[in-house]
Amino acid sequence: MSYSLHYFIRKTSTRYQLTQLAGNAGLHADISWVYLMEDIENTDFLRGGELVITTGMSIHSEQTLLAFAASLKRKQACGLLLNVGHYITKIPLSLISYCDENSLPLFTMPWKIHIADLMEQYCN
């Protein structure tokens, strides 16, 4: 059973301290899976509909982050959630603009929140 991204975010945003930064027009999409992706070259493994979470461990520039978001959009991911505070400390305005212009929902979650807890909640 899949849920809309809007429903999932509404049910989990307080518990996991999620903040939406962009892409409101894409919230109607269904989530097929919550996918942790650290190797940004592996977007070919996506099937579509994934809410992709990353810590940004392999993202070392604004251009790389933008290219990652564009690749997620091409692969029809339903959203991007950045686990911020360790590898990613600042969200570029260019990323926020890109996600808004392309209806790709963009969220942040503090580093102190365990990614596995969010993934488990979706699975249950």
Per-segment meaning from a language model:
Residues 1-124:
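Alpha-helical/coil-rich non-catalytic "connector" segments in signaling and regulatory proteins
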